[in-house]
UniProtKB/Swiss-Prot annotation:
This is FAD-dependent urate hydroxylase. Homodimer. It catalyses: urate + NADH + O2 + H(+) = 5-hydroxyisourate + NAD(+) + H2O; urate + NADPH + O2 + H(+) = 5-hydroxyisourate + NADP(+) + H2O. SUPFAM superfamilies: FAD/NAD(P)-binding domain. GO terms for molecular function: FAD binding; FAD-dependent urate hydroxylase activity; flavin adenine dinucleotide binding; monooxygenase activity; NADH binding; NADPH binding; oxidoreductase activity, acting on paired donors, with incorporation or reduction of molecular oxygen, NAD(P)H as one donor, and incorporation of one atom of oxygen. PANTHER family: FAD-DEPENDENT URATE HYDROXYLASE, FLAVIN-BINDING MONOOXYGENASE-LIKE PROTEIN (AFU_ORTHOLOGUE AFUA_4G09220). Pfam families: NAD_binding_9 (PF13454). Transmembrane segments: none annotated. Its EC number is 1.14.13.-, 1.14.13.113. Pathway: Purine metabolism; urate degradation. Keywords: FAD, Flavoprotein, Monooxygenase, NAD, NADP, Oxidoreductase, Purine metabolism. It comes from the Bacteria. The keyword Disulfide bond does not apply.
Amino acid sequence: MSLAQLEHALQHDLQRLAHGGEPWVRPRVHPAGHVYDVVIVGAGQSGLGAAFALQRERVHNVLVIDENPPGQEGPWVTYARMQTLRTPKQITSIDLGVPTLTFRAWWEAQHGAAGWDALDKIPRGTWMDYLRWYRAALRLPVRNATQLVRIEPDAAPGIHRLHLAMGAPLMARKIILATGIQGGGQWQVPEWITQALPAQRYAHTSGPIDYAALAGKRVGILGGGASAFDNACFALDQGVARAEVFVRRAALPRVNPIRHMEQAGIIPRFAALPDADKYRMMASFFGRNQPPTNDTFQRACAHAGFALHLDAPWLGVEEHNDVVVVRTPQGEHRFDFLAIATGLVTDPRLRPELAALSGRIACWADRYQAPPGQANPVLDAHPYLGPGFELLPRTPDDAAAVDGLFAFNYSALINHGLSAAALSGLKVALPRLARAVADQLFLDDRQAMVEAYLGYDQAEFVGQWPQPTQAVA
């Protein structure tokens, strides 16, 4: 089967499923222009999947926006530097149960069943190619080069304005923030590094780093997670002379809790847990860290320029004689550049697009008090979400301003587990999100919906009794 044949089969499958259909949502009229029922911010895998899931709910007045050029959405061809995805190849996600929309179907259309059997893990760039195909095959409404700056409530009830970096604001009844891992906060470089070094001497691994320009140079990498080793391998492949990873712990993590969550039924049912159980499990999740994949670690070790320093927290950094000096308990180390793989901080107050609303958004600290000795400020700063990923108000007075906003990004982790920004969870998370958005749209107009039902009188049955006398031939 070719890709063209696969796309034909996909359209046939969608017809069999009665995909789409006539819209039922009542349109809003606004003097300033068109009002979208839903605007999805972010055209990566979560945003595209959300648009498809809404189509399944017959919600069609939807726009997906992304600040990046077409085909550059998400991390896969920007700052992600692993060779392959860490997620097992057989896990389904944004296909929503349509076999001809799966990555496997797309791969086999090009490489056959034997090619699937030969595939170990999904190459990073190949996954991005699949997302490009997915968007085109489903004809999803995406507007690129569109950067959201600020969200604020409109004077008209139930409508939000999305102010953009360029162009007129958009108006929407519902907004889905499908903004990935960093979408609920920001990547963080420790302040003691930013204050000690000029900006050209360091970068967070989530941002652009021209490792090719550092060929022949020495790079120090702070962090013990998978991304630290991804960057070490990538840097060495680009010609860096030395890539040394520094880990605070005395040993690398060996257990990947995600694998257990995938196998034990936790991912689809995490949201049903009581808050106390969610809090305990996520505190453990943050404490464990995700180990590098075995193949990535072995690739790093195979490079002569690689070194790993365990039990080696950075005590300080400084620039001296055109060299960056890093102090650890093991001594001083000299580098030309530092790559910081220390993760991110999740807190809606850090998001510029939510600046007008952040003080009105409920966080875990507002809704749950951990037992003595278990409180975790990292968890407490996460937004406290409803069952459909909706942001909730801190106080009743904040309800109108926050209503209609959905955090379908990594900040949903504490309430929903691996869901919105994890391939392992999208299979379950996307239908839950789409139903919640559709329910809100329906309930917003419930009075009109009920009255329309009560007044419905279109005749369907046209039979007569007694039957009219038939003319004799």
